[in-house]
Amino acid sequence: MLPSATSLLRGPCLGLRAAALRLVRQQVPHVCAVRLMRCSSHRRGEALTGAPLDNAPKEYPPKIQQLVQDIASLTLLEISDLNELLKKTLKIQDVGLMPMGGMVPGAAPAPTAPEAAEEDVPKQKERTHFTVRLTEAKPVDKVKLIKEIKNYVQGINLVQAKKLVESLPQEIKANVAKAEAEKIKAALEAVGGTVVLE
């Protein structure tokens, strides 16, 4: 571009900026920082107290330091007991983990007092796996029971199944899902066996 064209393009922009600055200066009153300091409510000799410096180390009382050392030396079981005792002593309720966004829309409301009392009672964990144990067999139905046991015990022949039935109580199957354990129990009881799920 030519120098004259460049000066023409800059000219109107600079003119608009100057006009805008003049307009702002007319509308905004000038505030003097010194005048603000003189009008403040602080006394002249008093230093302004600011926030404590973040990089300055905080001094803790010896009692607090000793508590921290004692807690740090506890085992996990002792920490669990300490946590439980503190909750009881300070009457703090167990609170589940909150989602990151806070309350989830449509979530269940917080439990009321009767429900909270039910939570204090330890719930028995429902078992999902069982051991099927044959405890008794009717002498009349031994043949049917031996054949049925052969179906459920892997790698066993009729002679081994007969010895198993003659030396009761015996474990038929271990670590079986609840549905399968119930199925085995029903089948063995149908042919004259007495079965216990453990």
From Swiss-Prot:
InterPro entries: Ribosomal_bL12, Ribosomal_bL12_C, Ribosomal_bL12_C/ClpS-like, Ribosomal_bL12_oligo, Ribosomal_bL12_oligo_N_sf. One of its GO terms (molecular function) is structural constituent of ribosome. Residues 106-126 are annotated as: Disordered. Its main location: mitochondrion. Residues 1-36 form a transit peptide. The modification N6-acetyllysine is found at K125, K138, K142, K144, K150, K163, K173, K178, K185. Keywords: Acetylation, Isopeptide bond, Mitochondrion, Ribonucleoprotein, Ribosomal protein, Transit peptide, Ubl conjugation. It is found in: Mitochondrion matrix. PANTHER family: 39S RIBOSOMAL PROTEIN L12, LARGE RIBOSOMAL SUBUNIT PROTEIN BL12M. As a component of the mitochondrial large ribosomal subunit, plays a role in mitochondrial translation. When present in mitochondria as a free protein not associated with the ribosome, associates with mitochondrial RNA polymerase POLRMT to activate transcription. Required for POLRMT stability. Belongs to the bacterial ribosomal protein bL12 family. This is Large ribosomal subunit protein bL12m.
